[in-house]
């Protein structure tokens, strides 16, 4: 990584794309004498999303400017903020953040050896730090503490004392990390000015504060971990990235509150110094922009179409996400992710036989059904009636699926076809080949038996979820236990309607693009 030379060049790198700097003169004075020490902290709460690339790209700028950069995993802050991270999950979430932030930095080419990583609890539970918390609490008013956290700490009618402590701890971090400057979003401004007011009262120096703008989410508001359509998760599949970008607010010619343009400005341009608009030759072919202002001007004048802008962002974003997805595909990190962010709907069942135990709920949302694309079909080496298919369901590798369709569907009709796959059956070997799912098909009633694979809408992507109308919000089981016979109990009410639509209890099987159907077997069963 090349570094800037000279105080002015370093200053430009440190401050580019920032919304505000408190302490500009002090920053320049330090740059004339030595390298600047900066820290960025992140509370280990919800899953990081693609907006985290905004601070990551600035951290890359800081390193190019020769700064000494510390990344703080603020685990104690995560607990203090209205218990956004429960105490029992604190360690797991901190480990998750460490892995995902490092994967993001590696994805954009930041050398990790140039960074210092530290957890809040490594020093915030020390005797000295704790004494300073008490000293600070003796001079800070309740009004100032509440005001400082208003944009950051979760606001409730009756705030907990922990939320009032939060700004003071963040202020003390500047002293205990021995930095010249703290970097964060402009939503942290009140905490930064709080620190500037109160640290000197303890005899500590006032620090420089560097503030990023808040990047609009895809809906045009702040990108939020709690608004599913507003954010793109770092581990989202390519199909989900496409789907969320497709929904993004990006009105032709409108450059105000445009989350897609904002992401290009604050993430993609700083990382590559250029951005390529991908489009067909008949629309002018690809065009490379070396200045964001030129791209914004062309979009405002409708020279660049929103569809081309979204497709180009999708391609660039997936290049950043691919190495992160690959890293988190390991069994260890999959296990960590599930442990750090357990499914809240999966409450611990009552003890069997206790008076609080209830019959298990059998609902279709427990089935993990997805659209799949058949990428290859071969005859089973040891069974004439079976196919062995490779089916893409939006995972890093296609699944191997064994199907008894040889007598009903010619091989060439399966190749490259979209199918509907049940993905959470327990894998089982069929004549020596492990099958990792089941292709759902319509079957005729009576003889001669006819079988047709179910058809999703033609525009669907591999991996897209299939659900039953009215049950779209439930979470599927990780794996269906054979002894529970969940699928078998639900399957008893699967039917093909008179309109050839797949149904459960007269409720349609759906994707976001429409109904699941079959070609002709009205009134048939589904298996």
UniProtKB/Swiss-Prot annotation:
It is found in: Cytoplasm; Nucleus. L-tyrosine binds at residues 39, 166, 170, 173, 188. Its EC number is 6.1.1.1. A motif ('KMSKS' region) lies at residues 222-226. Disulfide bonds: none annotated. Residues 348-358 have a biased composition (Basic and acidic residues). GO terms for cellular component: cytoplasm; nucleus. NCBIfam families: PRK08560.1, tyrS. Homodimer. Belongs to the class-I aminoacyl-tRNA synthetase family. Catalyzes the attachment of tyrosine to tRNA(Tyr) in a two-step reaction: tyrosine is first activated by ATP to form Tyr-AMP and then transferred to the acceptor end of tRNA(Tyr). This is Tyrosine--tRNA ligase, cytoplasmic. It comes from Gallus gallus. The gene is YARS1.
């Amino acid at each position: 990584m090349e570094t800037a030379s000279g105080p002015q060049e370093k200053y430009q790198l440190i401050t580019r794309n920032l919304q505000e700097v408190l302490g500009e003169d002090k920053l320049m004075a330090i740059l004339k004498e030595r390298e600047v020490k900066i820290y960025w902290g992140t509370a280990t709460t919800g899953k990081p999303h693609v907006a985290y690339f905004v601070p990551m790209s600035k951290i890359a700028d800081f390193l190019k400017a020769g700064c000494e950069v510390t990344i703080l995993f603020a685990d104690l802050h995560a607990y203090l903020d209205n218990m956004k991270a429960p105490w029992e999950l604190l360690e797991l979430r901190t480990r998750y953040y460490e892995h995902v932030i490092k994967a993001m930095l590696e994805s954009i080419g930041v050398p990790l050896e140039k960074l210092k990583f530290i957890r809040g609890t490594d020093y915030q539970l020390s005797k000295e730090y704790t004494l300073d918390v008490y000293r600070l609490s003796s001079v800070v008013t309740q009004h100032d503490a509440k005001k400082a956290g208003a944009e950051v700490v979760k606001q409730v009618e009756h705030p907990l004392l922990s939320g009032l402590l939060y700004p003071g701890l963040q202020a003390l971090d500047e002293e205990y990390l021995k930095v010249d400057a703290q970097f964060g979003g402009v939503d942290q401004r009140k905490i930064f000015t709080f620190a500037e007011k109160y640290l000197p009262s303890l005899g500590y120096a006032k620090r420089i504060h560097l503030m990023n703008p808040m990047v609009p989410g895809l809906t045009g508001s702040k990108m939020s971990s709690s608004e599913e359509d507003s954010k793109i998760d770092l581990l989202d599949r390519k199909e989900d990235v496409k789907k969320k970008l497709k929904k993004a607010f990006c009105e032709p010619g409108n450059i105000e509150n445009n989350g897609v343009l904002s992401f290009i400005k604050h993430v993609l341009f700083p990382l590559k110094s250029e951005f390529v608009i991908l489009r067909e030759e008949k629309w002018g072919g690809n065009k490379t922009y070396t200045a964001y202002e030129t791209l914004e001007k062309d979009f405002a004048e409708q020279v660049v179409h929103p569809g081309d802008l979204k497709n180009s962002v999708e391609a660039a974003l997936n290049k950043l996400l691919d190495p992160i997805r690959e890293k988190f595909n390991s069994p260890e990190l999959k296990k960590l992710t599930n442990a750090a962010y357990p499914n809240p709907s999966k409450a611990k069942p009552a003890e069997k036989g206790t008076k609080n135990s209830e019959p298990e709920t059998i609902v279709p949302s427990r089935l993990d059904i997805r659209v799949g694309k058949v990428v290859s079909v071969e005859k089973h080496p040891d069974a004439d009636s079976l196919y062995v298919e490779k089916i893409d369901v939006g995972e890093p590798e296609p699944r191997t699926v064994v199907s008894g369709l040889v007598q009903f569907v010619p091989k060439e009709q399966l190749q490259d076809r979209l199918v509907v796959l049940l993905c959470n059956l327990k894998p089982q070997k069929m004549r020596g080949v492990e099958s990792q799912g089941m292709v759902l098909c319509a079957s005729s009633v009576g003889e001669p038996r006819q079988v047709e694979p179910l058809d999703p809408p033609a525009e669907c992507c591999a991996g897209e979820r299939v659900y039953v109308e009215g049950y779209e919000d439930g979470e599927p089981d990780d794996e269906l236990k054979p002894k529970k016979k969940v699928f078998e109990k639900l399957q008893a009410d699967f039917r093909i309607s008179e309109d050839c639509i797949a149904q459960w209890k007269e409720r349609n099987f759906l994707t976001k693009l429409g109904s699941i159907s079959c070609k002709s077997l009205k009134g048939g069963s589904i298996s």
